[in-house]
A protein has these predicted regions:
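Active-site metal-binding motif and surrounding structural segment of the metallo-beta-lactamase
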Residues: 83-136
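Active-site metal-binding loops of divalent metal-dependent hydrolases
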Residues: 26-28, 75-78, 109, 140-141, ...
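Metallo-beta-lactamase
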Residues: 85, 92-96, 129-184, 189-262, ...
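Zn-dependent metallo-beta-lactamase
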Residues: 8-68, 238
């Protein structure tokens, strides 16, 4: 395993023998009971001045490049900068053409994870942000999210998926192309899933919002914002111990300081 010389934080990348992992940092935000994501600059902003109960999180999809695929793990908030999707810009800064993304793996459909999956055209229609890619989502998560709606979900950002010809609706747990293992976990929301990417002896693990930050892996607590907080706690403990024993590389979507951790 080789670690490249550090790049600016948001574009840090690690190169493995067969796998390159790039955190695509969209920035730090606070979120409270309103479910709104407010930009937060650690250098100038004071968390104590935000609404009571505000959580400080990073929004951080991941690009995983293997010998077979260019994978995108979740898609961020869907913000635009200079009329271009922020996630497209971040992928280009990593030296990759967004059109080369072959698979979009969605852990669940909360807005901070799926809003970059599509983009709105001038006529108001929404199309796939990665038209060459196959999108993967749990079928019951899509059905549940559309039924549940706001504020937990924003169907406007993902309803287009239903009519997408290159959408694969997953059921339960299974395997994609013999090396991407998806696991239906529930926990954070009823039909949340996580991904294990295993190739040539390397094992990258993306726990979505069941395992969003490294510090949560090291302590036992039940989060009020989870659908089943106890299940999330138990899964984190299980993965953390197993991952350390087996040498997993953990990808943390909401971690400000540690987007990637490995032994």
């Amino acid at each position: 395993m080789r670690v490249l010389a550090p790049l600016p934080y948001s574009h840090t990348l690690i190169l493995y023998l067969c796998m390159r992992i790039v955190p695509l940092s969209e920035g730090a935000f606070t979120i409270d009971k309103t479910k709104d994501f407010l930009p937060f600059d650690p250098a100038t902003d004071d968390l104590q001045k935000r609404a009571t109960g505000s959580l400080l999180v990073e929004i951080q999809p991941f690009l995983v490049i293997t010998e077979k695929d260019v994978l995108l793990l979740d898609t961020g908030l869907g913000f635009k900068q200079d009329s271009s999707l922020q996630i497209h810009q971040l992928i280009r800064k990593a030296g990759v053409d967004p059109d080369s993304v072959t698979k979009v793996l969605l852990s669940h459909l909360h807005k901070d994870h799926v809003s970059g999956a599509g983009q709105k055209l001038t006529d108001g229609t929404r199309v796939a942000s990665f038209p060459q890619a196959i999108y993967y989502v749990q079928q019951r998560e899509l059905e549940y999210a559309i039924e549940k709606g706001f504020p937990s979900y924003e169907p406007e950002s993902f309803a287009f998926l239903e009519n997408l010809s290159n959408l694969v609706k997953l059921e339960g747990s299974g395997l994609i192309d013999s090396y991407i293992r998806y696991e239906l976990t529930g926990g954070h929301c009823p039909f949340h899933q996580v991904f294990h990417i295993e190739a040539d002896g390397e094992h990258a693990f993306f726990g979505g919002d069941v395992a969003p930050q490294m510090n949560q892996m090291k302590s036992r607590f039940v989060a009020k914002y989870d659908y089943d907080g106890k299940k999330c706690m138990d899964l984190r403990q299980k993965w953390w111990h197993q991952g350390q024993e087996e040498g997993w590389t953990f990808l943390f979507y909401h971690d400000i300081k540690n987007p990637i951790w490995t032994r």
